[in-house]
Curated annotation (Swiss-Prot):
Protein name: SWR1-complex protein 4
Annotated GO MF terms: transcription corepressor activity
Keywords for this protein: Activator, Chromatin regulator, DNA damage, DNA repair, Nucleus, Transcription, Transcription regulation
Region (Disordered) residue spans: 1-40, 345-403, 498-588
Subunit structure: Component of the SWR1 chromatin-remodeling complex and of the NuA4 histone acetyltransferase complex.
Domain SANT: 154-224
Keyword Transit peptide annotated: no
The keyword Amino-acid biosynthesis is assigned to this record: no
Family label: Belongs to the SWC4 family.
Gene name in the database record: swc4
Length: 588
């Protein structure tokens, strides 16, 4: 049924109201991100993702073609062109492909046939080589010294270890391989000129020498430095030339060899050695970082050891009144310290001015100890509570340390404790101070010979014990040396006395010889009976000689005394000798 029929049935006007417009569908434009993200997947699958974008962009891999503008360009021609390499000296001509430039294109021949064009192309192929090879800039030649003449070699470069032929061979290899010493050492094989055996039958054939890389370098650097000095004297050289000359002249082959050996050892280390070296480096770094703290603490400790210098004025204590006032002040301070220790920490607080102590306060240590039980009985409940708490606590076990643990934690058991604060460095310093300055100097000299400082840098317990043992041994050595020197001096004195005694005895014997001979002549002239009675015995002759020697020792020769005019002193050895002989005579 149409709408007009309905209007007729309901008696409605035919066109009473305008027909409503049809509602148009509004299509929202999707953002570009959705379009880009939905590429490669279907619309339904992309709609399932919702508002959340995929974590990974889904793109289809496809070939990226050339831009459209490149397809419109014409293909550029290439041609085979000849070239020569400047590094070669034989003039070899090679060919390579090269893009043909617009200027190199031959102009088109108007009205020419195809055959003429082909001939022109063939003729253009035989082009001249390029003027400069593009890769010739990488052909860098090292700067080598110019070749020496015979006169220069004989005057400046002659060597006992290197011949002229071997030197020329080395310089040729250096020029050929461009100072690449690894290649030069590998290719080095100098063969000396063979000697004609028929012409020189007695000639000595030199042994083949194997040159190391360091020897080759040393020889080349010496030649290069000498030739540089001949061309430019050191006074006319530039700074760069002078530095190069100094480096070449100071080349040390032994040091270079040691450096390479050390580098080889470093490269051939095992993993354990590398790990150990790393640990040592870390320890060294830690010690270096803490060194400043150690120095500060050590300086602080040394400053405490030094006696502070008094800066106060002491003129007021130079009189008797000032000394008595100082004594009263010290006594008052001592009493206040004792009172503070007796009253406990409560009395340490300052009392208000004008407050007097109460009558029931204890005035002495005995009273305070007598009052202690009464104060303790005032609170029995607190005592019971403390007893119960102590009963609940488990008994504390005392751990006994082993000797290793005592050494580790520094636990010591002293037989006798000295009052006051002492440092180990002070105790070690007192060991080097003897009763006399001479002994102290001897101790210091002995420590200097042993290269031990008199003040220990790190006076630990073990170091102080070893230092004390060392000082004791040095003192024993010095005492033994002193006794030895004393005995040696006594031996020298006794030897001198013995020599003096022997000399005097010899002089006495020499003086008594002519008198003995005259007596023997007189006795021979007398009769046989008189000779037996008158001839002196050997003992009597010895006694007479001893008496004469004593007289000569006691009363020097008058003639010599008169000539010299000087009275000679008698030595102790002579007196002792004379007294011994006189006693012997009396006994006989």
């Amino acid at each position: 049924m149409a709408a007009a029929d309905v209007r007729d049935m309901l008696d409605l006007p035919a066109e009473g109201q305008p027909r409503p417009h049809k509602k148009q569908k509004v299509v929202e434009k999707r953002p570009d991100t959705d379009v880009q993200a939905s590429e490669g997947i279907t619309r339904e699958l992309y709609a399932l993702l919702g508002e959340r974008a995929p974590p990974i962009a889904i793109n289809e891999n496809r070939y990226k073609g050339r831009p459209k503008w490149m397809s419109k360009l014409r293909v550029r021609p290439w041609q085979m062109t000849p070239f020569t390499n400047n590094a070669r000296s034989d003039g070899l001509v090679l060919r390579h492909w090269q893009r043909q430039s617009e200027s190199a294109k031959a102009p088109a021949l108007e009205g020419a046939s195809e055959m003429e064009v082909d001939q022109a192309k063939a003729g253009g192929g035989a082009a001249t080589p390029e003027k400069e090879y593009p890769f010739a800039k990488y052909n860098v030649k090292p700067r080598v010294p110019r070749r020496y003449t015979d006169e220069e070699y004989n005057r400046h470069l002659k060597s006992d270890d290197w011949s002229r032929q071997e030197t020329d061979y080395l310089m040729d290899l250096v020029e050929e391989y461009d100072l690449r010493w690894v290649v030069i050492a590998d290719r080095y094989d100098f063969q000396p000129q063979p000697i004609d055996a028929e012409a020189n039958a007695t000639a000595l054939v030199p042994a083949k020498q194997y040159r190391t890389m360091e020897q080759m370098k040393a020889r080349y650097y010496f030649i290069a430095a000498s030739m540089l000095a001949l061309e430019h004297p050191p006074s006319e050289m530039s700074e760069a030339e002078f530095d190069l000359h100094e480096k070449m002249m100071k080349f040390d082959p032994d040091r270079e060899r040691a450096r390479k050996e050390l580098a080889a050892l470093q490269l051939n280390r095992t993993a354990d050695e590398v790990r150990e070296e790393g640990i040592l480096l870390e320890e060294l770094k830690r010690i270096t970082s803490n060194e400043q703290n150690f120095m500060t603490e050590r300086r602080e400790l040394y400053s405490r050891l030094e006696v502070p210098i008094s800066v106060g004025n002491t003129t007021m204590y130079q009189s008797s009144q000032g000394l008595s006032q100082l004594l009263q002040t010290l006594l008052q301070a001592d009493k206040s310290k004792k009172r503070r220790s007796i009253l406990g920490p409560e009395a340490a607080a300052p009392s208000p001015a004008g407050q007097t102590p109460t009558s029931n306060a204890p005035t002495s240590a005995r009273d305070s100890r007598a009052d202690t039980p009464s104060h303790a009985s005032a609170g029995p409940s607190s005592k019971k509570g403390s007893t119960a708490a102590a009963a609940k606590e488990p008994p504390q076990t005392v751990k006994t340390l082993t000797p290793a643990e005592e050494a580790r934690y520094g636990v010591q058991h002293h037989d006798r404790l000295v009052p006051g604060v002492q440092f180990r460095s002070d105790r070690a310093q007192k060991l080097t101070q003897a009763k006399s300055n001479v002994q102290s100097q001897k101790l210091a000299t002995a420590l200097a010979e042993l290269e031990i400082p008199p003040r220990l840098l790190m006076p630990t317990e073990r170091v102080c014990k070893e230092f004390e043992k060392l000082i004791h041994s040095v003192n024993l050595l010095l005492d033994a040396r002193k006794v030895s020197e004393k005995i040696e001096s006594e031996i020298r004195v006794l030897e001198a006395a013995r020599e003096e005694r022997e000399r005097k005895t010899k002089e006495v014997k020499d003086k008594g010889k002519p008198e003995v001979k005259s007596e023997e002549v007189e006795n021979s002239d007398s009769g046989a009976g008189d000779s037996a009675s008158a001839a002196p015995t050997a003992d009597e002759r010895a006694d007479e000689r001893a008496d004469k020697g004593l007289q000569g020792a006691e009363d020097p020769d008058q003639s010599t005394g008169d000539r010299d005019g000087v009275s000679h002193k008698r030595s102790a050895s002579v007196l002792s000798n004379g007294s011994d002989k006189s006693t012997k005579r009396q006994k006989k």
